A protein has these predicted regions:
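Active-site region of glycoside hydrolase catalytic domains
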Residues: 1-336
C-alpha cells in the first residue's frame, strides 16, 4: 500500500540491501542464487510477479514496463553484489517460458506467434544479453510507453548479466493471429492442438516442447540452463488399499526427463531440474486443492476441509529412484 509495487524506483534500493544481507549471511553455504521468480509474468500477472494491482486500462503497460526496468536494475545490482561478495557464486534469472506454436503455416499466424514469444523473451534478452532488444522500441511506441531511466542504468545492466537461465515449463500453446491473448501461471492459453493430450484442466502435455524450448534458449543465449519448475496438475484418487496410483504423473515425469536427455544430447548445457512440487498445495493457477502436483498427498479439499494427513503417492518412490540414478533409471513401476 505504501510503495505500490515494482513500478516504484524505491524498491530497487530496498532489494539491493536485502540481497546484500542474504549474501553476507549465507555466502558460505549457498553458491547458486536466483533473483526473481518468473519475472516475465510482470506483463501478464503483475500482482503475482511484481506486487502491483494494475487496472486493465491504457496506463497498464506504462506501469508494467516501468516495473520491468526497475527490476532489471535491481537484478543487475544483485548480480554485481553477489560476484563481489561471493567469488565463484552463480546468480541467475528465472522466467516462465512455456512456448507457443503457430496454429498453421499461414504467415500471419507465424509472425504473430513470433512476436508473442518476443514478449516473453524480452526479459531474458535484457538480463542475459545486457541490453534492450531493438524490437521493444516499436512495442513501446505503439503502447505509448515512456520508461523513466536514470543515468548509468544501461551501463549497469550491460556489465552485470546473469550467469544462468532458469525457467518453468509446463506445456505449449497454439496461437492464431488475431486471437485474444489469455494467460495463466502455466503460460499462454491458446487454440486447441489436436496432436497433444491434455490434462483434466486442459493443459497440453508436450515433452517434445521442452526439448524445443531448451534448444531455442541455448541457441539464443549460450548460458547454462536450469529447469526450475515442471509438473502435472491433476486429480488423485485414494484406492481401497490406501495407495495412490498416480500413473499419469509418473508418465509425465518420465517423458519430460527423456526430453531433457535429448536436449543435452543436442548440445544444451542443462545443470538442474526440479519438479513442481513435492507436496500438494493450493494451485496458484486455479485456487484449487483438487489440482494436485505433489508426490505427497495432503488430505484437504477445495473448501479447506480435511485432516491434513500426508501420504506418499506411487510417484514418491518413483522420483526417489529417478533422483538416485540421476535420471538414468526411468522405468515405470509395473501395474498391479
Amino acid at each position: 500500500k505504501k510503495y505500490g509495487g515494482w513500478d516504484n524506483r524505491k524498491l530497487v534500493g530496498f532489494f539491493e540491501r536485502y540481497c546484500k544481507v542474504l549474501f553476507e549471511r549465507y555466502k558460505d553455504q549457498v553458491k547458486y542464487w536466483m533473483t526473481f521468480n518468473e519475472i516475465n509474468n510482470t506483463l501478464k500477472l503483475p500482482y503475482l510477479a511484481a506486487g502491483m494491482v494494475v487496472a486493465d486500462d491504457a496506463n497498464a503497460p506504462q506501469r508494467q514496463y516501468q516495473a520491468a526496468h526497475n527490476m532489471f536494475v535491481a537484478n543487475a545490482l544483485a548480480v554485481k553484489s553477489c560476484h563481489e561478495m561471493i567469488p565463484g557464486a552463480k546468480i541467475g534469472c528465472m522466467l516462465s517460458l512455456s512456448t507457443a506454436y503457430p496454429n498453421t503455416c499461414r504467415p500471419e499466424d507465424v509472425m504473430e506467434t513470433y512476436q508473442l514469444r518476443q514478449r516473453s523473451l524480452f526479459f531474458s534478452d535484457v538480463m542475459l544479453r545486457g541490453r534492450y532488444p531493438s524490437y521493444i522500441d516499436r512495442k513501446w511506441e505503439e503502447l505509448g510507453v515512456q520508461v523513466q531511466m536514470e543515468p548509468g542504468d544501461f551501463e549497469l545492466i550491460a556489465q552485470n548479466t546473469n550467469d544462468y537461465l532458469a525457467f518453468s515449463y509446463y506445456m505449449t500453446s497454439t496461437h492464431i493471429a488475431g486471437m485474444k491473448i489469455r494467460s495463466n501461471t502455466g503460460g499462454h492459453i491458446g487454440a486447441d492442438n489436436p496432436y497433444l493430450e491434455k490434462s483434466k484442466w486442459g493443459w497440453p502435455i508436450d515433452p517434445v516442447g521442452l526439448r524445443f524450448v531448451c534448444n531455442e534458449l541455448y541457441d539464443r543465449y549460450q548460458k547454462p540452463m536450469f529447469i526450475a519448475e515442471n509438473g502435472l496438475g491433476t486429480a488423485d484418487t485414494i484406492d481401497s488399499d490406501g495407495r495412490i496410483r498416480d500413473t499419469a504423473r509418473m508418465e509425465y515425469l518420465k517423458k519430460h526427463i527423456e526430453a531433457l536427455q535429448q536436449a543435452v544430447a543436442d548440445g544444451c548445457d542443462i545443470f538442474g531440474y526440479t519438479w513442481w512440487g513435492p507436496i500438494d498445495i493450493v494451485s496458484a493457477g486455479t485456487g484449487e486443492m483438487e489440482k494436485r502436483y505433489g508426490f505427497i498427498y495432503v488430505d484437504k479439499d477445495n473448501q479447506g476441509n480435511g485432516t491434513l494427513r500426508r501420504r506418499k503417492k506411487d510417484s514418491f518412490e518413483y522420483y526417489k529412484k529417478v533422483i538416485a540414478s540421476n535420471g538414468q533409471d526411468l522405468e515405470l513401476p509395473a501395474e498391479d
